[in-house]
Amino acid sequence: MNNDSQQAAHEVDASGSLVSDKHRRRLSGSQKLIVGGVVLALSLSLIWLGGRQKKVNDNASPSTLIAANTKPFHPAPIEVPPDTPAVQEAVQPTVPQPPRGEPERHEPRPEETPIFAYSSGDQGVSKRASQGDMGRRQEDKRDDNSLPNGEVSGENDLSIRMKPTELQPSRATLLPHPDFMVTQGTIIPCILQTAIDTNLAGYVKCVLPQDIRGTTNNIVLLDRGTTVVGEIQRGLQQGDERVFVLWDRAETPDHAMISLTSPSADELGRPGLPGSVDSHFWQRFSGAMLLSAVQGAFQAASTYAGSSGGGMSFNSFQNNGEQTTETALKATINIPPTLKKNQGDTVSIFVARDLDFFGVYQLRLTGGAARGRNRRS
């Protein structure tokens, strides 16, 4: 009997949950209605509280009413100073004064309208001034483009570009003494008699290996063996690979001297003299590289002694090493490169101005022409 009662107690209700027991019972219909009513009441109360809070916030913010500008905005008129009026003999009519009893009506000015509510006074003034300037510029532009007959000028960018640059004419002249002149642009070869080292400024010397004739190629003006003296005014700078030599004067074997003042060139006429360039790389960076290596060694040692008592001394030496490396690099980084050119190398002189030998040489008949002249005489 007891077993039957226990089995009946543990039987599963067919319409209930599979895991239901005596401690879990289904809700009746009235209980479901009560639970639904409670949930609905809580939802309505939350909605009501939220709407009330929003209403309080709306009431707390002050409402500012800004008068709308119903009239169209018109910029302030530009005051143009009137021309000096002619003297009028007629009596100016008197303007009737308004009666005192009636107060004057206050017409709002443009700057007092609500459109200027959030603009400062300076901004309004500058805006009116800029509008006035723009109007004047447009009027001036219209006046410039207009002709007396009301026609529009045809000047535009294309017509301006079509006007060529007018240059002064160059008049041709004849050389006064072409037989005795070496004209500008002549390239004279020369053999160096002194080696070149650009560490210091100084003088150089070269000798002409051949005769240099005049423009007509009839008379030798600079004989073979003429010595030319030049000067190196300064050395090279970083990145330079050529040295500038200024040739001052030439002296012929017959002791005729002439001032050249012409620059140097290579065999092909390129400016400057090439040579072997020493950039002094190791002199510039060897000290800094050595100090950097020593500093790196001490930095590696400081990592092993990081927590020991000697860590402070390693850091102090490292900081001093960085300053020493920077000082050494500044002292040697600006060493200029040096160009060296050997004695006996061929250089050129680019004649920069006409050389006139008329006051030095004279022409005379020689050989058969002179004998024929004597027989005729």
From Swiss-Prot:
Annotated stretches, region: Disordered: 92-161
Annotated TM spans: 33-50
Localisation: Cell inner membrane
Keywords assigned: Cell inner membrane, Cell membrane, Crown gall tumor, Membrane, Plasmid, Transmembrane, Transmembrane helix
Membrane topology: Single-pass membrane protein
Pfam families (alphabetical): TrbI
Transit peptide recorded as keyword: no
Major subcellular site: membrane
Composition bias, Basic and acidic residues: 101-112, 134-145
GO cellular component, one term: plasma membrane
Protein family per UniProt: Belongs to the TrbI/VirB10 family.
Role: VirB proteins are suggested to act at the bacterial surface and there play an important role in directing T-DNA transfer to plant cells.
Name listed for the protein in its UniProt record: Protein virB10
